[in-house]
């Protein structure tokens, strides 16, 4: 059921890491988790135009460090850093501890699953055909190095009466392989017909257990075309006989049946010299006697 489980949670112990990294006792765990959820909702609404990919929250002792991964870091920072200072003040007020905000730039937004999903939902809200938006995003991702991508849209697509689900895939998207680097993103488009959900899976190659070093794979398509029957035995080119049950070829080929049989001939007359063994045989002409008319009718 690899297509049902969340790709990030499925790979957390293997190749992925948590987006909230802190430790809390049982008494404070629920409170801190609720604070994280509210901070994420606030940042996504505040930085909607900044193309935010993901948010990492870390809490050292009596401090907080928030890292924002964005494809447009200039929008987050603002003119002369005014916006980011206001953002720090608001986050400090919400969390109640000093907050440090770091901005990381996303180099290739075309192969980031969350940014792809957000881009498609923005196009759907502008009444662009969903098939055109999905196929354009897939082409851009494959062109910039993704090994596979799958996009699924669900809802009242194009304003139809009955909701349906459509998905397209290009390349490989191995959902069951734990070492596969699968990036997953989800977004919702709020249209006049209702909400349309968009899910994106991007396959960016395999990773080792630590999640850092990629695995270099060779092209195995040529190896798959090898002869599955195994090596052929040493035999003449004209030998096409099938092997026996034990796998061995039968013995040497005997003479052909029609080669050793001689054509039927009449015995030579007495005193006639026999034909040479190697010479051509004399042709025998057979003549059918004509029957007299009286003999045919009977006397």
From Swiss-Prot:
GO terms for biological process: translation. One of its GO terms (molecular function) is mRNA binding. Keywords: Ribonucleoprotein, Ribosomal protein, RNA-binding, rRNA-binding. The keyword RNA-binding applies. SMART domains: KH (SM00322). Residues 214-299 are annotated as: Disordered. GO terms for cellular component: cytosolic small ribosomal subunit. Residues 39-107 form the KH type-2 domain. Residues 217-248 have a biased composition (Basic and acidic residues). HAMAP family: Ribosomal_uS3_B. This is Small ribosomal subunit protein uS3. It comes from Methylibium petroleiphilum (strain ATCC BAA-1232 / LMG 22953 / PM1).
């Amino acid at each position: 059921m690899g297509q049902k489980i969340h790709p990030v949670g499925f790979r957390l112990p293997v190749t992925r890491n948590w987006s909230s990294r802190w430790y809390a006792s049982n008494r404070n765990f629920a409170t801190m988790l609720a604070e994280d959820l509210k901070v994420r909702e606030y940042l996504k609404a505040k930085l909607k135009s900044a193309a935010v990919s993901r948010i990492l929250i870390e809490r050292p002792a009596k401090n907080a460090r928030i890292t924002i991964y964005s494809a447009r870091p200039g929008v987050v920072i603002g003119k002369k850093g005014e916006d980011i200072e206001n953002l720090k003040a608001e986050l400090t007020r919400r969390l109640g501890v000093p907050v440090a905000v770091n901005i990381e730039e996303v180099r290739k937004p075309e192969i980031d699953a969350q940014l792809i999903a957000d881009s498609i939902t923005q196009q759907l809200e502008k009444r662009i055909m969903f098939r055109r938006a999905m196929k354009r995003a897939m082409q851009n991702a494959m062109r910039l190095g993704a090994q596979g991508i799958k996009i699924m849209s669900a809802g009242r697509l194009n304003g139809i009466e009955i909701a349906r689900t459509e998905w397209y895939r290009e390349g490989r998207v191995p959902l069951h392989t734990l070492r596969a680097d699968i990036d997953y993103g989800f977004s919702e488009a709020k249209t006049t017909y209702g909400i349309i959900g968009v899910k994106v899976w991007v396959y960016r190659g395999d990773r080792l257990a630590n999640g850092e070093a990629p695995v270099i794979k060779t092209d195995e398509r040529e190896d798959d075309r090898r002869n599955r029957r195994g090596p052929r035995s040493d035999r003449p080119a004209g030998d096409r006989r099938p092997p026996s049950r034990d796998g061995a070829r039968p013995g040497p080929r005997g003479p052909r049946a029609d080669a050793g049989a001689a054509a039927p001939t009449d015995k030579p007359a007495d005193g006639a010299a026999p034909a040479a063994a190697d010479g051509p045989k004399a042709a025998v002409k057979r003549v059918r006697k004509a029957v007299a008319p009286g003999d045919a009718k009977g006397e």
